Amino acid sequence: MPQWNIIQAVNDALRVEMKRDDRVVLLGEDIGKFGGVFRATAGLYEEFGETRVIDTPLAEGGIIGAAIGMALYGLRPVPEIQFSDFIYPAFDQIVNELGKIRYRSGGQYPAPVVIRTPVGGGIKGGHYHSQSPEALFIHAGGLQVVCPSNPVDAKGLLASAIRGQDPVLFLEPKRVYRAAKGEVPEGEYTIPIGEAKVVREGKGMTVLAYGAMLHEAEAACAETPDLDAELIDLRTLWPLDIEAVTRSVRKTGRCAIVHEAPRSCGFGAEIAALVQERCFYHLEAPILRIAGWDTPFPYTLENDYLPLAPRIQKGLLELRERRP
């Protein structure tokens, strides 16, 4: 199997699914002749042509609106929003149209639109190129939200998203776009949406993470093996695999949640609520959230803002000593 990074895995997934199903169409800013700002669509314009790899104006609302129309007419569009920070001009189209079409039509019109967008920090992009808006779209309802941490999951989950009948927000973590590498199956390959993965087994505490922060949490756990932490890669944020989370927390009695979005009203708050509802009598300590600060994403202080391995390690050591 080839050794690929996440960008290469995404590119291959798109190529395989476009060959498999001629209804799959790509659209977005600079995705065609240029191959995308991160080169995730490189070569696809030459292979499939301008009618299936479509360069669009810089108008996010228009990109998503066009994708919705394509889906209603039987296509399977995969629009790219160049950075997740720029997804907000399309908020109305995503939340009020895309996420509600199946409900509004009484199930007559599914909208299989997969929105790809790079997410999070890691490139010193400041507050215009580093945000993590997953909680907003999970809250909106009607959308599946996926955030892989590695190339294998990126390919398998993207293929499943494209083949599904639901709208999906597919978040690609920039910090590990090229840094995370692994052997990726060639040809058709899928991973079911909605299934978390136990990355590291343990009995001392449960650590939940996704995207780029999975790697930081993994490093923190490896540096402190006596914590005996069980690390879970959520992979799919919504629908959340709450059963896998529940099983782990009931076993360990302690839970830490790691994400790079701001702490207040971040997705970790919802996970914490679900965990305490299901595991209250099994908890030996309050649930811990290790997250970005409640500030705009800084440029110079990026590494102080992100919950990197040293801060995670410090938090986990404190969690071990916590009592109800």
What spans do the regions from the language model cover?
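Thiamine diphosphate
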Residues: 1-167, 171, 176, 303, ...
